[in-house]
């Protein structure tokens, strides 16, 4: 089972040189530690609970290809590092008119994810589509967003279906866990309880206007 500590350890090994990595990866790891130390000075915080929540979700996400088909995914440390960055760092939710922090019913500040966009470039056969499919499912039904709209987009609909079809197969292979959270058909994955959906779309489609996107995977 992946833990936040695995992501920390990966970043430490990259910074120390134990893991050979490109410049952008090294900079990302250095930024990670800098933000942990200095982020609160500018309103950036790391929420370990949020980070661990998405990692725990992957305990129910199965492999969909190869000899490991049906078995739970074991996230590699670099997968974990990506996920805790995206889901762990938060900033206060600010009112766009008053520029003041928005408070919850208990009078505490509400927080939202710091990062709204991420770019991930890896070599083939490194489970990029699998990781993306898991993120798509998480954002559809485990992120606490009612009416969540998640889209897998590409130049053509067939390309967009790669991540989507993997996500559908994950649900089929995990009927006692993911199968209880989601329903699926040819057009979408959905969660009736929250009115959320996950669909593939082509970038040249005529129906892209007006989408209220909670998560887009391109």
Predicted feature locations:
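Phosphate/NTP-binding elements of NTP-utilizing enzymes
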Residues: 2-218
């Amino acid at each position: 089972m992946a833990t936040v500590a695995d992501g920390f350890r990966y970043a430490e090994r990259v910074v120390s040189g134990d893991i050979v990595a490109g410049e952008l990866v090294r900079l990302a790891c250095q930024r990670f530690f800098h933000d942990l130390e200095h982020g609160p000075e500018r309103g950036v915080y790391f929420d370990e609970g949020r980070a661990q929540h998405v990692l725990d979700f992957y305990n129910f996400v199965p492999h969909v290809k190869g000899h490991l088909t049906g078995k739970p995914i074991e996230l590699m440390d670099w997968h974990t590092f990506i996920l805790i960055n995206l889901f762990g760092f938060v900033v206060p939710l600010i009112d766009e008119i008053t520029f003041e922090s928005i408070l919850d019913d208990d009078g505490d500040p509400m927080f939202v994810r710091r990062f709204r966009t991420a770019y991930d470039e890896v070599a083939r056969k490194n489970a990029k589509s699998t990781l993306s499919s898991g993120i798509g499912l998480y954002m559809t039904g485990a992120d606490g967003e009612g009416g969540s709209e998640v889209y897998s987009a590409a130049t053509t609909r067939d390309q967009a279906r790669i991540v989507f079809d993997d996500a559908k197969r994950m649900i089929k292979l995990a009927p006692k866990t993911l199968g209880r959270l989601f329903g699926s058909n040819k057009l979408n994955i959905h969660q009736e309880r929250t009115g959320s959906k996950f669909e593939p779309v082509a970038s040249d489609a005529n129906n892209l206007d007006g989408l209220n996107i909670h998560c887009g995977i391109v």
